[in-house]
Amino acid sequence: HPIELDEIINAFNKIQNDTQIEDEIWKNDDILGWLYESYNNAKKQAFKDSKDKTEYDKVSLQSQVYTPKWVVEFLVNNSLGKLYLEMYPNSNIKNRYKIANAPQTNERNIKPLHEIKLIDPACGSGNFLLYAYDLFYELYMDQIDNFDADYEEKDIPKLIIENNICGIDLDDRAIQLATLGLYIKAKQNRRTITNLKFNVISSDFFLPDFEEVKEIFETSNLTSEQQKLVEDIWDDLKYAYKFGSLVKIGEKIQTKVESIYEKVKREGQDLFNTVDIQDYYLFEQTFFKNLESAVQKYASSKSNSFLVDKTSDAITFLKLVSQKYDVATANPPYTDSSDFGVDLKEFIDTNYKQPYKFNTNLYATFIKRCYELTDENGKIAMVHPPTFMYIKTFEDVRKFILDKTYIDFFVEWGYLGMFNPSARVDSAMYILSKAPNEKDSSFMKLNELYEGKRFDTFNVAYDDFLNKVQNKYNFTVPQSKLKIIKSYPFIYWISDEFREKFKSDSVENLLKNCQG
């Protein structure tokens, strides 16, 4: 794409010749992502002016927003950093990073650091991954220096890239920038490093039609129902280029197993449903091996090296969407359901409307997806518009969050002031934990401030919170109290006395409506 390359070079030159921009900007590890968003601005505006509906191939263009480094640091520190302190509460990490509600005692079973995984399912050019690399590096050094862990400093870059950080995005160019950024970081830490296997992948890969590989699965003695499930999953995988990490693979098998368990609850255990459960567990174990074999066999039969690479990417994608993570971070795309194109709407309604309605906005589907991708004690850290906090159509989202997660820290930012001036959006950022917790949830309310004052106010209020100093912008509330008001709006700042009024009967229940 020579024209696009020329545009990128011109963009670099404009910045380099701008006397108001300091030289230090070129030392920032997220400079590539920042430039890429600037490069896309004209295309974004053209799409916005077209008034077209947002289809899968325009999601990145329509809603790709560069996440400022301070936001990334806050979210990663309070998810990955806090998870580490839950295992090592006496670590020096708590003195070096600003982590809210840092535990004083061990709250989590110790897990080897090289087994802890973080994913960004809409990673763009990799801002979250780049900072996660830095924090993971510090955690490894803490393990070596203070906990006698059996790691060597020279191995840390490879451990982080091949074991700890994962990312998926629809945008192939953004993924290339994310991979390049991580490679540069690894090279800075160890200049001789080579042959890294990245778990950062574009879902824009190629798969053949199922008919071309079906014989691999036919040798597995599948039932007709299982054969149909294989075809459905293959189709989902084949069209991952449209929907990226929102595609569900392993969940379809798990849903089938759960339906058998529900049948057992209703009808009791018998030989047939016991065999069904055993069959599906065996099916699950062999399915992914067969799927990988099918992809590899197809790739090896082709002489086109590019096609082989793009087909092999499917194996990495399959692995990433099928495993569980300790932390999921995201600044997901924002698109209201009224702006969905036909294909996108059909996919979202099919996969994210039941049993809870997460189909009202694209960012809401990523809340659900991050929950699904994390393990039973995982953490979720996200930034996106705050519309889900109050609007009726997001009631199911709020109910899901309150029923199934613990709100650790929540910042209601408000309109403007978080992202660059061209991103005219409301924002909120928060950290959720899937592990049960009886502690009060912490909130910060900044949305009524003038946008230019929010950043400084945030820093002061956050420092006050960490130092247990009263601040009018900070609030704590038992999460259960957010369920008192009908439809569960996140109204966290009112007094208990006022909140209790919502427990009493409403006017329509107390008065009889009469005619005449």
Predicted segments with their positions:
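Preference for the N-terminal adenyl/adenosyl cofactor-binding alpha/beta module
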Residues: H1-L135, N164, I168-L177, F198-D326, ...
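Post-Walker A helix-loop "phosphate-sensing" segment adjacent to the P-loop in P-loop NTPases
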Residues: F136-Q143
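Short, flexible, glycine/charge-rich loop motifs used to bind or transfer phosphoryl groups or to couple energy/partner
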Residues: N106-N109, K154-I156, T316-K319, F400, ...
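Pocket-edge positions in alpha/beta enzyme catalytic cores
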Residues: S63-Q64, E153, S303, P355-F358
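Signature of N6-adenine DNA methyltransferases within the class I
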Residues: L130, Y137, L170, I175-F198, ...
